[in-house]
From Swiss-Prot:
Residues 108-167 are annotated as: Disordered. Induction: Slightly induced by 20 J/m2 ultraviolet light. Member of the csa1-cas1/2-cas4 operon. Residues 176-264 are annotated as: CRISPR-associated endonuclease Cas2. Homodimer, forms a heterotetramer with a Cas1 homodimer. Can form a Cascis complex with Cas4 and Csa1. It comes from the Archaea. The gene is cas2. In the N-terminal section; belongs to the CRISPR-associated endonuclease Cas1 family. This is CRISPR-associated endonuclease Cas1/endonuclease Cas2 fusion. Keywords: Antiviral defense, Endonuclease, Hydrolase, Magnesium, Metal-binding, Nuclease. One of its GO terms (biological process) is maintenance of CRISPR repeat elements.
Length: 264
């Protein structure tokens, strides 16, 4: 229930009491002895000013304030629509670029380029240690070593052990991944390049890397890149290529904030 305070003639109120009354949120109105409204005290809230309150009164009197508010909201919506259209055009360019790279994969001779950093990483700490952050097994070339009772070489058996955290074989590198980025800061670009190389991706263009990763590591890579470019003026698009084809039915997200990573 709203509390109404009526002050009749001959009643005075101190400034401290009036300030405390306004702080509670009560509306204090001043009337003439004839009952005519003279004004309303303004609450001491944030950026409230006399000019703003006067504009509110005028808007309430002639009804144009609602029209102005609707016009302002409509213009904001149109501005967001333009932002989404701009991002959609940019994303379409990323998609076309990645699709052209995917078509060039079979004859580009990229297998050796991707295998070199992967072998270097396996030689440093074995297995996927550079990705999971812990050593697993020493590098054993395929076919080397004694065979296990199941018939597979012990090196292959060790490399195909299931990762309990991901629930799949750590050696199942079967999906092509294309990473395209647009980064202005040199230090952030270098950080992103180091991360991509650590995951075994090979650089094929100035702002494009390609490699083969299991699906679980693709999501992990996207999260790590998002942390690396957080707060920077950077856009990164990750395209998962299955059987050297790209799904062109991409969802168009709203305009991303600074440091955006899109996973498709």
């Amino acid at each position: 229930m709203d509390e109404v305070l009526l002050l009749t003639g001959g009643i005075s109120i101190t400034t401290r009491a009036l300030r405390a009354l306004l702080a509670t949120g009560a509306t204090v109105a001043v009337f003439s002895p004839r009952g005519e409204p003279l004004g309303i005290f303004m609450r001491p809230v944030g950026d409230a000013t006399g000019a703003k309150r006067r504009c509110q009164y005028k808007a309430a009197e002639d009804g144009r304030g609602l029209q102005y508010a609707k016009s302002w909201v409509f213009k904001k919506i149109l501005g967001q629509r333009d932002n989404i259209k701009a991002w959609r055009r940019r994303l379409r360019g990323y998609s076309q670029y990645a699709e052209s790279l995917a078509k060039a994969l079979p004859g580009a001779g990229l297998h050796g380029a991707m295998e070199t950093p992967r072998r270097r990483r396996r030689g440093q700490d074995g297995g996927q240690a550079g990705v999971r952050g812990r050593p697993t097994h020493p590098p054993v070339p395929p076919g080397a070593g004694r065979r296990s009772p199941g018939g597979a070489p012990r090196g292959q058996e060790a490399s195909l052990r299931r990762d309990p955290q991901r629930g799949q074989s750590s050696g199942a590198l079967h999906m092509y991944v294309i990473v395209v980025y647009d980064i202005t800061e040199n230090d952030v670009r270098a950080k992103v390049a180091d991360i991509l190389r650590a995951y075994g991706l090979a650089r094929i263009q100035r702002s494009a890397y390609v490699g083969r990763l299991p699906p679980a590591l693709v999501k992990e890579l996207a999260e790590r890149l998002a942390r690396a470019v957080r707060g920077a003026n950077a856009d990164i698009a990750i395209f998962k290529v299955d059987k050297r084809t790209i799904d062109t039915s991409l969802r168009i997200p709203p305009r991303p904030p600074a440091g955006h990573v899109a996973l498709h």
